[in-house]
Amino acid sequence: MGDVEKGKKIFIMKCSQCHTVEKGGKHKTGPNLHGLFGRKTGQAPGYSYTAANKNKGIIWGEDTLMEYLENPKKYIPGTKMIFVGIKKKEERADLIAYLKKATNE
């Protein structure tokens, strides 16, 4: 399991320009991530997803996020997420630990 505090710093630096995590948070360029774990791809209410995201049909969890965050465009070809990914597994684990906590509060 990753480090929540390190993950928060990664989120602020690499994700917060496009995403929010708090309950009731607004969508930005990317969707609000509250309730992410256990939700199917392309399902945040009120956000306009690409068909690729909606049709991927996986459930977000630690394993799926670990793979997705390494290279989003490879994992979901056709996604509009422009983020190149996080190559270091430890950094992805830290970010996932933070997301698991922050998107469930």
UniProtKB/Swiss-Prot annotation:
Its main location: mitochondrion. The keyword Cytoplasm does not apply. GO terms for cellular component: apoptosome; cytosol; mitochondrial inner membrane; mitochondrial intermembrane space; mitochondrion; nucleus. GO terms for molecular function: electron transfer activity; heme binding; metal ion binding. Heme c binds at residues 15, 18-19, 81. Binds 1 heme c group covalently per subunit. It is linked to Thrombocytopenia 4: A form of thrombocytopenia, a hematologic disorder defined by a decrease in the number of platelets in circulating blood, resulting in the potential for increased bleeding and decreased ability for clotting. This is Cytochrome c.
